């Protein structure tokens, strides 16, 4: 394909231009490039004329291969678009080829018969001739005029058939071309081409059956397709018969039968009649008279059954032919000696079965069977009278002397009907042979010896030589017992008495047996005669005795017949079973052998396929490489030829031979070309320089010479111009004068018409003025009407707009009033509910105080008992000083390892019964795999708390002030040294203590340490360390934060009992069945279950569930100040809300608000402890103190449990100790003895009723907020909490905060700490002096409930305020929060 792109129209035009000048090859190349172009793969109307012109050129130039390639390309182009165009193009192509061939045939006298195969024109004779004459084979063939065109036409037919095969869209065209090809072979007697054509059609048919899944495949089940194939095969059969190619005709018959087998419907009777007629001809030509007669029988029966208009003459003609064909069958089948010796009977039978299959017969026919069928179907009655008796003479009558004479008359009549019945003439020789054989058989039964001349006189239609040959053949094949005596010229019959006839000996008219047959059956005949004689001469009593014996035998048989029959059946059954078993074994063995053989064959086949595949790949690679090499050589050759055509290339490559392509490459050619270009360029530049110099000198010399001549010419031109100007000026003046005179004359002549003109104009204006005024008046009227209509429409629209606005305002006012009414109803309902809750809470407090009083008394008794036991134990030990010093419970506690984190040596002295506190040396946190089991245990413990409260639980809740002061073990005693966290003789309080990790919601140790815990008690139950500090302890506070806070929850605390002692209210976190256990920061379990079950799970630092609630979170609001769902961490928890790891507020605070300010923006203390897992967590609120339980993994434990992880952000154990934790107060918390007041969460009915009431009374649901509102709400929460922490006063740092001399040191802040600190500093709002309204303090008159504190959004985010904050800031909002403070210091939120 050329490098340039050419449109199809331009290519056709270009080709026509080439044809006009007689250049057919360039025109063909142009069209070929367009057809092969990949840019023209879509059929266009211009493609058809291009293809016709292309094929015309191919025919003219006899380029059959180019025509084939073009047709294939055109098929791909138009197959899916316009298949009719392909049919037209192919028909036109074949028509052109046929016309050219016919023209060559008319103009040539040379015949094509001397060349047997057009594909193999080169014969041995032509090779010798070319060697002698030195003439090329193709030249000799081209010199012949007709042969090349016949070959071209044959190739055209074959190429078109290959092109159209197995394509249902051009199936009709395919069969038309196939029939044309058969006619071509018949016309030019091309036998070799006919065989090839038959093979091709047979191969195409097999491909149709094999590739039936293609989109354009032919469906052989289609009746139209079957009829077309049968039609083509019948034409093939006719052509084969006409050309006497009987082998090809037989193959065509097999193909037709195969098509019949494919068809589900029977073929048409006309088609079957034609088929039987052709097949009968093939059988007769092949010498198979038996199947020829059988075919005629089938044709006769088909015609009688299917043809309704069958005439009597046709019946006679068909019956006569069937009779003659049947009687023409040889009496005995001919079988040669070699066939008898080789035992070819099986092969012959197989061949006969195949032939019978072609006729639809179940078994091969026989001569006797056909004759019987002919008689049975009464076919003889339709035979012409002249031939009717032939059957009786040959098959029934025994009359040897007149047999040949009678048959001769019939044969003479048949010969006379040669013109009317030509097909009957072929049976005459066979009938004569059968007549001679019948004559010999009958003569052999009559005569023992007969003269040859006498026998010859009985057979008048043959000569002596043929008669002798017939006698010899009869003796060989027909078991005729005859001997020829040439000396006496006689024939002897039956002379050999030892001769035995064959079983298949022919039957015919019979008179008597031959002597040999009589000798062979003599004993049989004698036996029959003797048995008859014995029967005649036997006496009567012998016959009677024989009859009696016969009856006895019959009776015995009848008696034992059934038993014998059963025995025979059983034996037969046994034999059958044994045979079946043997057969099954044989079948199984054969099957196994077959499978083994098949596996081996499969393996060999796979190996062979793999080898062939590899060879094919290698061949394909070699072919591709060769193609690439050829393309490369072709490119180089074309490039060299193009370059050599130029003047530059001719010079550069004059010494290079194009044939030596192996030594050349494109780079070499390009280098030579560039070198020659550079050389010529240099020569051209030098030549141009020389020429430039020469021209420069020449021009300078010319200008020097022409200067004086130019001056002279200038002067002459100036003078001439002056004279010309003067002459023209005079002519102009004279012309102007003449024009002036003519203008004056015209003015005078036209001035007489002025008055008439003015009169005409005035009349015209007067007539038009009235018309103008009328139109103007009409316009003014229409303008007024349109203006009035528009004003009316505008008035109506304004009126409608005012009405709509009025109704809309009215509806809005009604809606506002309805909302206000609803708000008032909700407020009243909430007020009633709050009063009811307060009453229930008071009842609950009273019951709880009674329970605590009982527990305190039990505890005191148990303490006294334990004190007496301890004293007796110390006295029994011998009064050692060390033990006496520690004899008191408090002194011993000072040195116990669980309090001061003693050295390993000291920890070894701890009694083994206290190992449960440390968790033992090998104690490790245990993760609970089944949270449901733990919750069931917890609930069981809570349900039995009143009946099974142990003395140990009571001892931990109560402290005895007097005993503490006497023993010097008071926790508030200032002489004991620094508070918790700074003591040298005690470990830090429970952090990662000796008792193992604190109880968490991920542990499988059962419920948290509660009232009926059956394990070793936690601090204070039966502990020798003394009870924990209670709220009524008069000792110094062990929580070293400040002194002005109320005490932690104790037994006699008037704030109401801790959670977990009463069954009426919802238990605190960790004991509730309905809620999940408290969550840690990085807990990846299910969602945290608190008061509200529809919230998302609580998030932690390393939680992989996505980010926690931040500014960009679109989930519902977190529990905060205004959340009426109750605080998350315990119903009565007065602490601030739990903080998340993305919280931008200040560091988290402890449990009271009266202490120093929280860590704020300007705090210069150490890094905060808590939220970040890679920083040391806070102990309460300061960094310098001993570490509290949790939050950091790289610090030491307070109780020596160095290998036990502490609780914190990454701790999967239980939650931290909350404000309502029943494990005793935490060190560092508020110790103020102010009575404890329950929050609004302590309501009767449980948290579910409160949640339901909240949802009924509150505003829109949490999840119904827009993402922007929820984001603002959370930002408001965080910023408000930060501001509240920053407003707290700074407290003095105590030794407890600095952590004493503990070996644990805060770890270095990680790079992430500074980043998070910077982020929090940037986001933190400015500090204010406003106190936290939801904390209790002594210096305040009132306390607000956790939900009652309004939030304020950060300054940067005030424009994003959500619906919660808007209802506080906007007075018009119906849902506005109204905090009210009662006399007890509690704040109630009214909405």
UniProtKB/Swiss-Prot annotation:
Keyword RNA-binding: yes
Subcellular location: Cytoplasm
Residues forming coiled coils: none
Record's GO cellular component terms: eukaryotic 43S preinitiation complex; eukaryotic 48S preinitiation complex; eukaryotic translation initiation factor 3 complex
Intervals holding Sequence repeats: 973-982, 983-992, 993-1001, 1002-1011, 1012-1021, 1022-1031, 1032-1041, 1042-1051, 1052-1061, 1062-1071, 1072-1081, 1082-1091, 1092-1101, 1102-1111, 1112-1120, 1122-1131, 1132-1141, 1142-1151, 1152-1161, 1162-1171, 1172-1181, 1182-1191, 1192-1201, 1202-1209, 1210-1219, 1220-1229
Function (record text): RNA-binding component of the eukaryotic translation initiation factor 3 (eIF-3) complex, which is involved in protein synthesis of a specialized repertoire of mRNAs and, together with other initiation factors, stimulates binding of mRNA and methionyl-tRNAi to the 40S ribosome. The eIF-3 complex specifically targets and initiates translation of a subset of mRNAs involved in cell proliferation.
Protein name per UniProt: Eukaryotic translation initiation factor 3 subunit A
Origin species: Xenopus tropicalis (Western clawed frog)
């Amino acid at each position: 394909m050329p490098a340039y792109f050419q449109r199809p129209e331009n290519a056709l035009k270009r080709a026509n231009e080439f044809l006009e000048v007689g250049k057919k090859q360039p025109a063909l190349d142009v069209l070929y490039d367009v057809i092969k172009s990949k840019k023209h793969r879509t059929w266009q109307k211009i493609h058809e004329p291009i293809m016709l012109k292309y094929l015309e050129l191919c025919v003219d130039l006899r380029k059959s291969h180019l025509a084939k390639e073009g047709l294939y390309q055109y098929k791909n182009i138009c197959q899916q678009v316009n298949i009719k165009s392909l049919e037209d193009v192919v028909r036109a192509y074949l028509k052109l080829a046929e016309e050219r061939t016919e023209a060559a045939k008319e103009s040539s006298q040379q015949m094509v018969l001397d060349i047997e195969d057009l594909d193999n024109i080169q014969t041995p004779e032509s090779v010798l001739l070319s060697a002698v004459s030195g003439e090329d084979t193709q030249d000799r063939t081209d010199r012949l005029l007709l042969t090349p065109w016949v070959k071209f036409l044959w190739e055209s037919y074959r190429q078109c058939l290959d092109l159209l095969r197995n394509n249902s869209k051009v199936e009709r065209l395919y069969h038309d071309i196939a029939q044309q090809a058969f006619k071509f072979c018949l016309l030019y007697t091309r036998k070799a081409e006919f065989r090839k054509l038959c093979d091709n059609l047979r191969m195409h048919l097999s491909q149709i059956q094999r590739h039936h899944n293609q989109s354009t495949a032919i469906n052989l089940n289609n009746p139209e397709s079957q009829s077309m194939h049968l039609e083509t095969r019948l034409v093939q059969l006719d052509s084969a018969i006409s050309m006497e190619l009987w082998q090809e005709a037989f193959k065509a018959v097999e193909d037709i039968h195969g098509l019949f087998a494919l068809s589900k419907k029977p073929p048409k009777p006309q088609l079957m009649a034609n088929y039987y007629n052709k097949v009968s001809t093939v059988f007769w030509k092949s010498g198979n008279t038996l199947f020829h007669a059988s075919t005629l029988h089938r044709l006769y029966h088909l015609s009688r059954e299917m043809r309704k208009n069958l005439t009597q003459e046709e019946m006679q003609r068909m019956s006569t032919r069937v009779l003659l064909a049947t009687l023409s069958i040889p009496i005995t089948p001919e079988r040669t000696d070699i066939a008898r010796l080789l035992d070819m009977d099986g092969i012959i039978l197989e061949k006969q079965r195949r032939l019978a299959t072609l006729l639809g017969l179940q078994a091969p026919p026989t001569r006797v069977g056909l004759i019987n069928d002919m008689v049975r179907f009464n076919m003889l009655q339709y035979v012409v009278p002249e031939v009717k008796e032939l059957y009786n003479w040959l098959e029934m009558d025994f009359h040897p002397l007149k047999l040949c004479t009678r048959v001769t008359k019939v044969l003479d009549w048949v010969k006379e009907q040669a013109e009317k019945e030509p097909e009957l003439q072929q049976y005459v020789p066979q009938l004569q042979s059968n007549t001679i054989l019948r004559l010999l058989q009958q003569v052999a039964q009559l005569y023992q010896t007969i003269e040859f001349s006498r026998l010859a006189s009985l057979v008048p239609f043959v000569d002596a030589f043929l008669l002798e040959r017939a006698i010899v053949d009869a003796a060989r094949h027909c078991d005729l017992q005859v001997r020829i005596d040439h000396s006496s010229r006689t024939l002897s019959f039956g002379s050999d008495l030892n001769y035995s006839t064959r079983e298949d000996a022919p039957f015919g008219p019979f008179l008597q047996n031959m002597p040999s047959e009589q000798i062979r059956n003599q004993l049989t005949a004698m036996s029959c005669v003797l048995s008859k004689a014995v029967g005649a001469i036997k006496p009567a009593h012998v016959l009677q005795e024989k009859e009696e014996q016969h009856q006895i035998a019959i009776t015995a048989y009848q008696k034992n017949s059934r038993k014998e029959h059963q025995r025979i059946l059983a034996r037969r059954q046994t034999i059958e079973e044994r045979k079946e078993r043997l057969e099954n074994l044989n079948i199984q063995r054969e099957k196994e052998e077959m499978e083994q053989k098949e596996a081996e064959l499969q393996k060999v086949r796979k190996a062979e396929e793999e080898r062939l595949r590899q060879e094919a790949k290698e061949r394909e690679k070699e072919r591709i490489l060769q193609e690439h090499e050829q393309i490369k050589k072709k490119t180089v050759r074309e490039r060299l030829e193009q370059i050599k055509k130029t003047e530059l290339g001719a010079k550069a490559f004059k010494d290079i031979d194009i044939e030596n392509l192996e030594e050349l490459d494109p780079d070499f050619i390009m280098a030579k070309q560039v070198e020659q270009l550079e050389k010529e360029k240099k020569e051209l530049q030098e030549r141009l320089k020389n020429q430039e110099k020469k021209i420069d000198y020449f021009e300078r010399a010319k200008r020097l010479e022409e200067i004086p001549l130019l001056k002279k010419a200038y002067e002459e031109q100036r003078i001439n111009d002056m004279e010309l100007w003067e002459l023209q000026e005079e002519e102009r003046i004279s012309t102007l004068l003449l024009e002036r005179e003519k203008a004056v004359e015209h003015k005078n002549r036209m001035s007489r018409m002025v008055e008439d003109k003015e009169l005409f104009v005035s009349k015209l204006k007067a007539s038009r003025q009235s018309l103008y005024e009328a139109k103007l008046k009409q316009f003014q009227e229409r303008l007024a009407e349109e203006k009035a209509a528009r004003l009316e429409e505008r008035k109506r629209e304004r009126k409608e707009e005012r009405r709509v606005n009025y109704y809309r305002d009215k509806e809005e006012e009604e809606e506002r009033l309805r909302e206000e009414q609803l708000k008032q109803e909700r407020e009243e309902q909430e007020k009633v509910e709050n009063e009811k809750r307060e009453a229930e809470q008071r009842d609950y407090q009273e019951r709880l105080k009674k329970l605590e009083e009982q527990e305190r008394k039990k505890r005191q008794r148990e303490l006294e008992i334990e004190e007496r036991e301890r004293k007796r134990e110390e006295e029994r030990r011998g009064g050692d000083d060390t033990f006496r010093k520690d004899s008191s419970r408090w002194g011993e506690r000072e040195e116990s390892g669980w309090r001061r984190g003693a050295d390993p040596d000291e920890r070894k002295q701890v009694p083994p019964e206290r190992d449960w506190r440390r968790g033992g040396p090998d104690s490790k946190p245990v993760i609970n795999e089944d949270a449901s089991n733990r919750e069931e245990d917890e609930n069981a413990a809570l349900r039995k708390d009143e009946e099974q409260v142990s003395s140990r639980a009571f001892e931990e809740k109560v402290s005895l002030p007097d005993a503490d002061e006497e023993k010097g073990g008071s926790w508030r005693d200032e002489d004991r040294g620094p508070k918790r966290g700074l003591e040298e003789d005690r470990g830090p309080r429970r952090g990662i203590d000796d008792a193992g990790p604190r109880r968490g919601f991920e542990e499988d140790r059962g419920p948290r340490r509660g009232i009926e815990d059956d394990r070793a008690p936690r601090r204070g139950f039966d502990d020798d360390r003394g009870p924990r500090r209670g709220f009524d302890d008069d000792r110094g506070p062990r929580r070293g934060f400040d002194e002005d806070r109320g005490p932690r929850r104790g037994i006699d605390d008037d704030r109401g009992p801790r959670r977990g002692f009463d069954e009426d209210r919802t238990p605190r976190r960790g004991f509730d069945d309905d809620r999940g256990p408290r969550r840690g920061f990085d807990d990846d379990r299910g969602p945290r279950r608190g008061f509200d079950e529809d919230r998302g799970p609580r998030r932690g630092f390393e939680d992989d569930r996505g980010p926690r609630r931040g500014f960009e979170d679109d989930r519902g609001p977190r529990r905060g100040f205004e959340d009426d769902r109750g605080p998350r961490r315990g119903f009565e928890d007065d602490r601030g809300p739990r903080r998340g790891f993305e919280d931008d507020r200040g560091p988290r605070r402890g449990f009271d608000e009266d202490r120093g300010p929280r860590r704020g923006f300007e705090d210069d203390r150490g890094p905060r402890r808590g939220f970040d897992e890679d920083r040391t967590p806070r102990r309460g609120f300061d960094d310098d103190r001993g570490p509290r339980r949790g939050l950091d993994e790289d610090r030491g434990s307070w109780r020596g449990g160095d290998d036990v992880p502490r609780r914190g952000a990454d701790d999967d154990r239980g939650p931290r100790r909350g404000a309502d934790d029943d494990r005793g107060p935490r060190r560092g918390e508020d110790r103020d003895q102010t009575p404890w007041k329950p929050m609004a969460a302590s309501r009767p009915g449980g948290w579910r009723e409160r949640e339901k009431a909240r949802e009924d009374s509150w505003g829109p649901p949490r999840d119904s907020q827009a993402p922007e509102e929820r984001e603002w709400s959370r930002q408001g929460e965080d910023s408000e909490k930060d501001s509240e922490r920053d407003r707290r006063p700074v407290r003095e740092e105590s030794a407890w905060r600095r952590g004493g001399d503990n070996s644990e040191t805060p770890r270095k802040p990680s790079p992430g700490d500074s980043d998070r600190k910077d982020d929090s500093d940037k986001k933190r709002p400015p500090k204010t002096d406003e106190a936290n309204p939801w904390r209790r303090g002594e210096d305040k008159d009132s306390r607000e409930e956790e939900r009652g504190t309004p939030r304020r959004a950060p300054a940067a985010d005030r424009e994003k305020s959500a619906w919660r904050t808007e209802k506080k800031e906007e007075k018009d909002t119906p849902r506005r929060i109204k905090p009210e403070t009662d006399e007890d210091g509690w704040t109630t939120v009214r909405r």
